[in-house]
Regions:
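Helical lid/core segments from catalytic subdomains that handle acyl or acyl-like groups
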Residues: 131, 198-283, 290
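Long, hydrophobic alpha/beta structural blocks
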Residues: 179-180, 197
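A glycine-rich phosphate-binding loop feature that marks nucleotide/adenosyl-phosphate handling sites
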Residues: 180-186, 240-246, 357-359
Length: 359
């Protein structure tokens, strides 16, 4: 009556089925034994799709990795003969609410609500889900981002998106409608947490032009400063503490759910209009040495959301990084310019798509 909540599900696990549709489709819990995730496969690829209320990217990758371990032991007797069937030590079962255990009651709002530039355009037919991936060598990326620009790989790749968007939609972007990229930050390292529940906050990398022309070097510098100014523990703590404080407030807790839903929609719409896109970096994924010969790559996708019909994810495994864009738009100019800029910096780029743009 007052809050949504999750219960332990004792029903049989959802059936693993062959992938037959676009990823990130709605999960109908009533048709899925009340589970909010699905597992599918396509040839030698295992897919995990998760409703974000269950966990964030780090929690999802942990589950997918353990699921892959279990599958490989079933498939390859040489593994099952030497490795026990127990969960690996890197798999956490911790379900602590790390927001509650770490929030500061005195925090004030640090959110920006100014509207951002939103990408618009003709949509793919039949609710199409376009995927374009660029595979890049991590060693070369690190060399270019650090030695040439003095920034992290994450900042470099976000800058490539911002610059591509700026070049494509320059006349629509202004100080009043800046390019703003929502960047999720994993809070576990800051608070020594290993929870499998959500534990992240969003910061915004902002590019607000105040002159006619910008070079890529200038955009990189702006994005670097924007991100670094927010990457302090006190600031990150204040972001989630403000949310938790509102949730814990007695007056808010006593408001009926149907009224909360109205407020949630208003807040969601404001947040959607405040960011041009979301780019999340899952980071470098490692697996136990025994399994490495059987695993080629990890990938991650984000589904679209209101106002953000083009999103990006960054995932790396060993020395290969996958920079993935999902989009509902027919036009791929932004994605193309992202990878052109990366290639211009001497980084080898191998492109793959899911074929939607050729149908």
């Amino acid at each position: 009556f007052f809050w949504y909540y999750l219960e332990e599900n004792g029903k049989p696990a959802p059936r693993v089925e062959e992938e037959k549709d676009y990823p990130c489709r709605r999960i109908y819990a009533q048709k899925n034994n009340s589970y909010l995730f699905r597992v599918t496969y396509y040839k030698n690829r295992i897919n995990l799709e998760v409703f974000h209320v269950l966990t964030d990217g780090m929690g999802g990758i942990g589950f997918l990795r353990e699921l892959t371990y279990q599958y490989l032991r079933l498939k390859h007797s040489e593994l099952s003969d030497t490795i026990s069937d127990r969960l690996s030590e890197e798999t956490s079962l911790n379900r602590e609410d790390s927001y509650i255990s770490n929030y500061n009651k005195a925090s004030k709002s640090v959110y920006a609500s100014k509207k951002a530039f939103l990408i618009k355009g003709d949509k793919l037919p039949y609710n199409g889900f376009g995927v374009i991936q660029g595979f890049l060598p991590v060693s070369k990326l690190k060399e270019v981002s650090r030695n040439k620009y003095g920034v992290s790989i994450n900042e470099y790749l976000i800058s490539a998106f911002v610059y591509a968007t700026y070049r494509t939609y320059r006349r629509f972007i202004s100080e009043e409608k800046p390019i703003r990229v929502a960047v999720p930050v994993n809070m576990r390292p800051f608070f020594d947490s290993n929870t499998t529940k959500n534990f992240f906050v969003m910061i915004s990398a902002e590019f607000s032009p105040n002159k006619e022309e910008y070079s890529f070097d200038e955009v990189v510098a702006v994005i670097h400063d924007s991100i670094q100014s927010q990457m302090k523990k006190e600031h990150l703590e204040a972001i989630f503490s403000y949310n938790v404080s509102n949730e814990q407030h007695f007056a808010a807790r006593s408001v009926p759910l149907f009224l909360k839903n109205i407020g949630i929609k208003v807040v969601y719409t404001r947040a959607a209009l405040a960011n041009t896109t979301t780019i999340t970096n899952i980071g470098n994924i490692t697996v136990k040495e025994e399994y490495e010969p059987y695993i080629k790559m990890f990938h991650s996708f984000l589904s679209f959301s209101k106002g953000q019909e083009l999103k990006g994810t960054i995932t790396s495994y060993k020395d290969i990084l996958a920079y993935t864009f999902t989009s509902s738009f027919e036009d791929t100019t932004v994605q193309r310019r992202v990878f052109q800029q990366i290639a211009k910096d001497g980084i080898d780029v191998q492109i793959e798509t899911n074929g939607v743009y050729y149908e």
